[in-house]
Amino acid sequence: MTERLISMVLSCLFCQLLSLAAGTPLREGQIANIKPKGWLLEMLNRQNSGLTGHPEALSYPYNSCLWAGEISRNTESYGSNWWRYEQTAYYTDGLLRLGYLLGDSALIAKGELGIDYTIRHATADGRLCNASLGNNMWPMAVFFRAMQAESEYRGADSIAKVLERHFLGYQPKDFSHDRNIVNIEGLLWTYSQTGNRQLLEMAKEAYSLGGFALDAEAILNDKPLKMHGVTCCEMLKLPIILYMYTREEGYLSLARRAMKKLTDDHLLPDGVPSSAEHLAGKNPIHSHETCDIVDFTWTLGYFLMATGEGQWADMIEKAVMNAGMGAITKDFRSLQYFSSVNQVIATGTSNNNHFKHGSTWMAYRPTHETECCSGNIHRLLPNYVSRMWLKSDGGEVVAALYGPSTFSGTSAEGHSYTITEDTDYPFSQTIRFRFAADSNIKLPLMLRIPGWCDSYSISINGKPTTDCRQDKGFVRVEREFSDGDVVELSLPMKVKKTAWQPYGVYFSYGPLVLSYPVATLCEEDTVTYANMNGKRPENPEFKCWSMKPAASWQFGLSADARPTRQAAETTGFPFDKSQTPLRFSVDATEIAWPLDEDRFTPELKDARKLTPASGGKPQTKTIELVPYGATELRVTVFPVTEK
């Protein structure tokens, strides 16, 4: 009995040492301990009653068995053979994490059914994924994330063992081309769970072979990045994940340089790089794919965990709350494939990008010609919530991303506790952390101080405190907490003005970008477009929309324009335009800035060279700005007129 006990203790110690060996500052895997509240819970419930819970509205391939069987093609002429497995892997990951966060047994069963089927149908040598895909391992790189979610939620060591056998069925060279290289993410997670260093060495060798779009050579040269946007966002995380597990500075340098090259040349004001389908530059007329929003924020999470730097969490919040929320209708019943900071029309023929010009790709629809974004969008908010709370190597509980939620855990002494994050953030600057515990607990609490916040304050049980150490954008609050204790964090927000080339300006308030919400004529679009390959929503409650401007939107702002916040206390959902509590007024000048060809959002113009809209003396009008994420049609970057 004693020998068995010693063996168990040594085994536990080994597992602890293994998980800490790389010295990663922050770690995820807390999804079972996180519960959304407030507006986050409302949005996730809308997601469940919307597209995630109604795959028939998404049409093909989501109206299939997903990964719980064979998915047949819907057309012999459109789409590569791997598409339908990539797309349904995105969807499975999103619906499963949503199910865990909401405690929805139907979603959980549906997601786990695909995992069970995939495991039961492994090849004789342990390989997973559909046999028809041959050596295309990209869909499995996506599906791995769903398997990771189940393992972390259920504490299922068996999944790591299955993945270990799967990965060991390949050679490093098998991973080192195209998007196969993204399997490094799964390789290294599996290494962290099993301790098999062969997996680590495989990942390092595969990356060193190069030959993929964002390899070390592409990162280190002086050429700007010119590649597929989603591929870039996916491959961007690889050197930072390698750094997580090796702590080799060379990988960190590669990761930082790759991120700088991408953001310097392509990051848009809403926090996501342009990509339609390829990286497109910083002109506000350019769009980004909805997949870019989800994949970029997922990659930023690895930068956050690997470095422990709060700046990456700032970027996640900005991208999710602006670009992410702005690409969907707030009932989660339709989405855009391409979205942009300036979009004043969204119809079946309004896509202003060069790729698929004049097509459906910027319309708000449940179904799209290419189906990847319709699957990936389901990951956006579940990913955000599952990484709101992290753990550190030093035992700290880390409030990394803010929003109403609860986090439950057990202290080092074995005492249970729950922290309730009581806030309307980002619509409020006050965040209260309320402790409930069955005994006093000594717990280090890490709170992020966003880079946009010039000054912050912390109080404990109503008494201000300055006894907090700040490092890398976080403050450490360490004390013995008692049941009922409240830590209050105040993050004052101010309107910030940012110039944008070539002729523009935009405003932000805390993490939220501000936009002019264009009055909209919204009508159901019943046209079955030729590019849709016959796809229509298979649920009449889910509509394809045609959105056109119903009033003037052609405004320029003077160089000294400064929005003023208006009183707007509401109790509704804060991302609904009519309910948002954040409203700002600013004086604007009407200018001649018409649609291109009567159906495309026009490029940003030099307003100093434009005539007034009336043709005579410039007319000034007070307009209202609201959070970008509360809009569908919008102007975010305004032309600057004469002062």
Q: What do the PLM-derived regions correspond to, one by one?
A:
Residues 22-87, 105-127, 204:
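Low-complexity, Ser/Thr/Pro/Gly-enriched N-terminal "stalk/linker" regions
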Residues 24-33, 99-112, 147-161, 191-204, ...:
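Structural helix-adjacent loops and short alpha-helical linkers that scaffold large soluble proteins
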Residues 59-81, 128-143, 179-194, 217-238, ...:
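Carbohydrate-binding/catalytic loop surfaces
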Residues 70-71, 77-81, 89, 98-208:
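Extended ligand-binding groove/face enriched in aromatic
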Residues 82-100, 135-151, 176-192, 227-244, ...:
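Well-ordered alpha-helical segments within folded domains of soluble proteins
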Residues 244-265, 284-332, 343-344:
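Catalytic-core region of carbohydrate-active enzymes that cleave or remodel glycosidic bonds
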Residues 255, 314-322, 327-434, 470, ...:
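C-terminal beta-rich recognition modules with glycine/proline-rich loops and embedded aromatic residues
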Residues 453-479, 497-502:
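Solvent-exposed beta-strand/loop surfaces of large extracellular or lumenal domains
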